[in-house]
Amino acid sequence: GRSMHWIRIERFWEGEYPEVKMTPQQPMLCQQCGHATCEPVCPAFATVHSTAEQLNLQVYNRCVGTRYCANNCPYQVRAFNWRDYKRPEPLPNQLNPDVTVRRMGVMEKCTFCIQRIHKAQDKAKSEGREVADGEFTTACAQACPANAIVFGRVDNPESLVSQLAHKGHGVKHLEELGTLPNVTYFKGG
């Protein structure tokens, strides 16, 4: 059967035959592009860009399932929801109330846990302050046992992700396409 993944482990190869070797595997998720090729092809305007958060978002209740966005994504990170996930009572109570339940026939993707971002922004606003670095993180970063995923604002010089970015050695996948990806991959060490 089909299963839904918003992040996958991608294998890459380097070298020329017969001396080809596999490079370290990397997670591949929505790159939250500044010039996302998936946005202009959506006839229902379900794929939108949030300039405030600098994210590429999916408005699920607008999506009509044409899959044009998936065809236009060079990272192949969008997934079509082939199933209607109905659960018998009381199992629906286990669902995260902060995440929209999507219906069959819509496109899905990583949103960098926008619901967590908004929750932290609302809390900071009610307390009359800015959102602190590390105040929230994405679910994948929280669940990663190796702490290999770091989330934050690269435009905040105090943030850990900004400090990592300024050390250099970062790689952005398919940057040459002009999509302005916002995910940077760093070598471990």
Predicted regions and their residues:
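Non-ligating segments of multi-cofactor redox enzymes
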Residues: 1-189
